[in-house]
Amino acid sequence: MSENFKVLIIGGSVAGLTLALCLEKLDISYEILEQGEDISPQVGASIGIMPNGSPVLDQLGVFDDVERVIEPLEFARIRYPDGFFFQSQYPAIIADHFGYPISFLERQKFLQILYSKIRYKERVHTGQKAVRIESHESHVVVRTADKQYSGHLVVGADGVHSIVRSEIWRLSEPGAITDEEKTALRVEYACVYGISSGVRGVTDGVQLSLLDHGVTIHVFNGKAGKVFWFVIIKIDKRYSYTDMPRFSTQDAREICESLKSKLLDTSVSFGDLWAKCDIFMMTPLEEGHFQTWHRGRLVCVGDAVRKLTPNIGQGANMAIEDIAVLANALFRANVRDGLPDDRQIDDVLSQLSATRLPATKTTCKQSEFLTRLQAGDGIWRRLAARYIFPALHDIPAASSARVLKGGQRLDFVDPPQRARPELDRWAWVKDLRGYVPRPHVLYLICGALLAWWASGLVWHFPSKLDTTILSHV
């Protein structure tokens, strides 16, 4: 009896479970090795599924289950520290043009949905932390503390602290991985995220955002009175990945206490969310991407190759697209009917990096820009965020098209029925209700500069609050 091609998936989160569902569609054998004891732990996190990730989930029979447990976003209300606010219809515009709503739900619930669709649950092994990978001529071996697993391809879906990425570096020729790549990730921001329940004044379908100096707060509502929130703060300096800061529960608590008076809406303060908080965590926000995604029979996807901030909401969606490209490449290589040699494996993995690296670079740049714009990092961004951004009304929805447009699809499953034909981005902008011609934008820029120079009433410079926040990190 001939040996079947097997994929060893390191990590049983979004990317790992999505890949398992794809491999089941392709009738390709796999094993998932998840270091945690629970495949869907409650860590206080939420997840945003965007229209570039939704079609793949739709093809896998997952999105209907997601849609049943969300409150679709319809519009956003963005507030500034001087009390000014404006509303944007960007969530409704995006849903109308792509056929899928922006969907927020508990990360735990999303993982439960993915896991419920797995047919061969006996192939999912929890409590199995990979500690070493051996690459042989025609196969690979993954060793955990007490077991070993053999296969023909290792996929690192194991997050930012990826053991698979470390093993790719270890197995590479001397000098192949540069010092620049090893230090590609850096940390300038941190995030306190949490889930609250029963917060009065938070309306279904409305995103609340506060763009303050050095602090950004985003709030999304879910089913059954759940409220998901993120507090993104700029920390005291830039850290490298190898020297990134660690945060305690007390750090997070003190930061949230210091923000209680911040108004998110006319009748909702951050203190209202904090008083009803069920669970919260704090984490540094790594930013950046790696150039080397694979070597031999090892490959990385998702957070193992790029890190984005929550501001752009693309971490999970980019991972889902990675999986779609990898699964399509395996489908075209017809690995189910034979064992591919090293050259054929390299061809498959090269398709992934060639397709996804350009999108990664673009999205990382957009994430970095948006994070700093929303935090008012520097006088020019403060001016743009306060005066230019509101004047554009719904036009920023069109800029989202650059990330969402051209989302990957599975070639071996029927096309998603509800996905709509993509529109030209410029035509989309013209159709928006809040369209502002380019010359007017220039006038607004000049007006903003004059207003700032004449009155000095733009956002305050670092205050006692800002100093307090930074002192905790």
From Swiss-Prot:
Gene3D superfamilies: FAD/NAD(P)-binding domain. FAD binds at E34, G48, R107, D303, A316. Pathway: Secondary metabolite biosynthesis. It is a single-pass membrane protein. One of its GO terms (molecular function) is monooxygenase activity. Keywords: FAD, Flavoprotein, Membrane, Monooxygenase, Oxidoreductase, Signal, Transmembrane, Transmembrane helix. It is found in: Membrane. Disruption phenotype: The disruption of the whole terpendoles biosynthesis cluster abolishes the terpendoles production. Its cofactor is FAD. The chain crosses the membrane at residues 441-461. Its EC number is 1.-.-.-. One of its GO terms (cellular component) is membrane. Its main location: membrane. Pfam families: FAD_binding_3. Residues 1-22 form the signal peptide. FAD-dependent monooxygeanse; part of the gene cluster that mediates the biosynthesis of terpendoles, indole-diterpene (IDT) mycotoxins including terpendole I, terpendole K, terpendole C, as well as the kinesin Eg5 inhibitor terpendole E. Terpendoles biosynthesis begins with the synthesis of geranylgeranyl diphosphate (GGPP) by a yet unidentified GGPP synthase. Belongs to the paxM FAD-dependent monooxygenase family. This is FAD-dependent monooxygeanse terM. It comes from Tolypocladium album (Soil fungus). The gene is terM.
